[in-house]
C-alpha cells in the first residue's frame, strides 16, 4: 500500500476479518462498530498516521491515511469511506423506485469522497504522495463492493 499503491488485498483482508468476528448484535451500532474495527487495525500500520473523521470540505471522511514521511518514503495516501446498510435494506428499492438503496448510497459516497479530495487541505496533507479514494460498501457485516474512484 505504502510503496506500490496496491491497496486492494490489504483492505480485503480487513473486511474479511470483520466478517469473521461480527455478529448480529454488532448490527445495532453497525457503522460505529465497523469504523472502530477499521480504526484499530489501520492504526497498527506504521507507514501512516490514521486520521478518523477528518473534516474536509464541510464533511468528515471516515479515514485519511496520512503518509509518515519522517520515517518511511511512502508514495501513496488514502481517503477511505465506509458505507453500510442492513441486509434487509441493501437490495430494497429506494423511494424513487428506480434504484436500490445500495445504488443510491454508492452514488452519494462517490460524490462525497470526490468532494473530500478537492478540499484545499488535502494537497498539504498528502505531501506530494499519490492520493487514492477508496469506497467500501457493506451489506450488514459483509463487504459487497470496494472500488477506487
Question: Could you describe each region identified by the protein language model?
Answer:
Residues 3-149:
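Structural signature of nuclease core domains in nucleic-acid processing machines
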